[in-house]
Amino acid sequence: MSRVMIEPASYDNIRKSVDRAFELFPADLSGKKVLIKPNVLRTAKPEEGITTHPALLEAVVEKVDSLGAGEIVVGDNPGMIDYGDNEKSFEKSGLMKAAKSCYRNMGTSSRKVGFNPDYMPTVSVSEDVLDADFFISLPKFKTHGLTVITGAIKNSYGILPGAIKAHLHKAAGSPQRFHELLVDVFRLRIPDLIIMDAVVGMEGNGPASTELRDIGQVLASDNAVAMDSVVSSMMGLDPGKLRFLQKAKQEGLGDYDPQSIKCIGEIKTFTDYHIPPLGGEANINNSAIQELIGNKTLLVPKVDADLCTSCENCIEHCPVGALDMGEDDIPVADSELCITCFCCQELCPEKAITLQ
């Protein structure tokens, strides 16, 4: 039976929760190379709730160091791929300072490994991920327009450097296939320990929504499927309705059935948690809608002219070239080309894009 720790926490006393996580999931880290991967979607301030909070990263780095790790590497591959974006993302989020000189740009060195040929025969994975003796994942408690939630499994998408993430979005072609692809990426290097920042969560059109909610908890587990099941339940969702959890169970990576999970601590269940449009219970249960989603997008990006600064970031990062500059220098999406990958929404620095 998988276990998930649910511990009350604030950013001021988060070290206590980290210590508790290592008590429940002990690890011999003496002399080992330890990779710590926060969720760094893009450049964002800590108070925006988009990235893993620096207080959690700092506490984990200090704990791992106290356990005698031989080498500590802190890194991620954010969605933005321009030169210097990795460093900028860590600096602005406060994670560079929290990493305590352990930061490394993981995107500069990678190796090709075999992958699911239905998408691509090989993919590049950051060498620091493949070479780590122990892999700690630090996801954020958030919703996601494409995958409904972004938790333990989705955080592993960041082991892929550069534009490979965008290429896989294009190769998937539909939300349902992307759910399945996520599990294939996750299997390339399964985290040994997951500690989730659920002190402040995100709802609505995540993973870069303006809607934040106080959760006041830190979650931990050595099984990502179990953790994402608990996160789904906390958001008021049936975890068995999420395709990526279904596939993960089929692949023997864990069980999302709440009866197979031992929760150490009290689960907070929110009956009014704001779920993205594609993630609503009505859509999940509606086979006709799901069939349409599998073949053609129901939602396309809409840009708020009052918020947009015409930076063209969304246009540059669209993997299928579905966005172009329209009238009044406001980007417009071609619904025939759009594959609903949500990259534009994720990477918009002004949060000016919604899927409608």
Where in this protein do the model-derived segments appear?
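Short Fe-S-cluster ligation motifs
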Residues: 338-355
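Short, contiguous acidic/charged loop-to-helix segments that flank catalytic cores in large enzymes
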Residues: 306, 336-337
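Cysteine-cluster motifs in flexible loop/terminal segments that predominantly coordinate metals
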Residues: 310-314, 341-344
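N-terminal and secondary-structure boundary signal
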Residues: 1-305, 309, 315-320, 324-330, ...
